A protein has these predicted regions:
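Alpha/beta-hydrolase-fold enzymes
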Residues: 1-37, 161-162, 177-286
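Short, surface-exposed "cap/lid" segments of acyl-processing enzymes
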Residues: 58-138
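Alpha/beta-hydrolase active-site loop
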Residues: 141-159
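Gly/Ala-rich beta-loop-alpha elbow adjacent to hydrolase catalytic centers
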Residues: 167-176
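Short beta-strand/loop motif that positions the catalytic acidic residue
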Residues: 318, 324-326, 330
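Conserved alpha/beta-hydrolase "acid-adjacent" motif
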Residues: 331-337
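Catalytic histidine neighborhood in serine/cysteine hydrolases
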Residues: 345-362
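Catalytic histidine-centered segment of alpha/beta-hydrolase-like enzymes
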Residues: 358-373
């Protein structure tokens, strides 16, 4: 893999100070939440056994798992490729899914038997289906670059037949878009869900936070964050960031568990989500810093100034059919960030499909509404373009 220099110790003092301030903010939010927990425990009778059960459920996590039968066809240091194809698949163009890459397990695209993007793809008649499964960063992959990830996608495309329906969720969506711009001849259709293309559009909470943490465009805070992880971005930092965006969600989820501790179905749903949400994995530091600098800060993808491997990433090179899915209440990737691709690409208007779900970010990938009402419409259009 190509390499760039990743800091392994904290940089200038300003970055360290910002990092300390970030952790202080997280501790304050955590303390406030714990205070609410303490007050909640005093409301209404709870037996010692119920409280012990609640504490156990809050504290003990299992590794999340994929739910649909499949096989791993290859594995590398950055990703493994999972094949979900039917035993005797129809003769259709293969579909390749790039899951989110934000410090969580890729199995969000196959969350459960009744909340699975992969099953929805298969049920749409796209019976040749694959998903990349991002591998958590280690010291040996801390220097992985955007070029390395494009190479991973290209390897998966080659295995799937050389030309695919590319589906990208969240961070996997901008990666799919970059790949489609670089290699349009290898992408039959492009579908993105909750994926930022214009990173500065809409009222994104992440962009507001980034403005506060990059005074004068400085990346000192983010370099300090990577340095604190020994050259990788620790997944636990990403988790804390997500919780800080809306700490009341965290508090409400734990309190609802306490209120429904005797409801077996509620407990099962809680464990399923917490096992995925709280199981974190690390991201290569070089790759993460590149994302922050070129995409979140500079917005280079939509402005046309992005380069990968010495090549310009020209969104106008994208001329294949597009399917775009956004969430009306998505504060992480507002709809304007997703739908910006239609204006930047060269795809004819009649070949662009839009869907807007009512929920937020995660619901786009595993929510009942999106999977039952939005994805089937988009995937039917993809399937129509996928016949031999």
């Amino acid at each position: 893999m190509s390499t760039v220099q990743v800091p392994i110790c904290a940089p200038e003092e300003s970055g360290s100070s910002l990092l300390e301030a970030w952790f202080e903010l997280w501790l304050e939010a955590s303390s406030a939440t714990l205070g609410e927990f303490a007050r909640a425990l005093t409301r209404g009778p709870r037996t010692p056994l119920e409280l012990a059960r609640w504490l156990e459920l809050v504290a003990v996590r299992d590794k999340p798992a994929w739910s649909t039968p499949h096989r791993v066809v290859w594995e590398g240091p950055l990703a493994r490729l999972r094949d979900f194809s039917s035993p005797q698949p129809a003769d259709v163009v293969s579909t390749l899914v790039l899951p989110p890459q934000a410090g969580h397990d890729s199995c969000i695209v196959d969350y459960s038997t009744d909340q699975s993007q992969m099953r929805t793809i298969l049920e749409a008649g796209l019976e040749r289906a694959f998903a990349l499964d991002w591998v958590g960063a280690t010291a040996s992959t801390a220097h992985a670059t955007i070029e390395d990830y494009i190479a991973v996608v290209d390897r998966a495309v080659a295995h799937a037949g050389g030309r695919v329906n590319l589906v990208g969720d969240c961070q996997g969506g901008w990666l799919a878009t970059v790949y489609a711009a670089l290699y349009p001849e290898r992408v039959n259709t492009l579908t993105i869900a909750g994926a930022p293309i214009d990173f500065h559009a809409g009222q994104a909470v992440i962009h507001e936070v980034l403005d506060d943490l990059t005074p004068g465009g400085s990346l000192a805070f983010y370099k300090a964050l990577v340095a604190s992880g020994g050259g990788v971005l620790k997944g636990e930092h990403m988790l804390r960031g997500f919780i800080l965006i809306n700490p009341l969600d965290e508090y409400s989820r734990q309190l609802e568990l306490l209120r429904n501790i005797d409801d077996a179905e509620h407990v099962a749903r809680y464990r399923e989500f917490e096992d995925w949400f709280k199981h974190t994995q690390d991201i290569p530091g070089a790759f993460y810093l590149w994302i922050v600098e070129h995409l979140f800060r500079d917005n280079a993808l939509i402005s046309g100034t992005l380069e990968v491997g010495g090549r310009a990433v020209d969104l106008a090179a994208i001329d294949m059919p597009l399917a775009l899915l956004a969430g009306a209440s998505d504060h992480i990737t507002p709809p304007a960030q997703v739908f910006a691709l239609a204006e930047a690409a060269s795809t004819q208007p009649q070949a662009v499909r839009y869907e807007l779900a009512s929920g937020g970010h995660l619901g786009l990938f595993m929510g009942h509404e999106a999977l039952a009402e939005k994805w089937p419409s988009l995937l039917s259009a993809v399937a129509a373009h996928s016949q031999p």
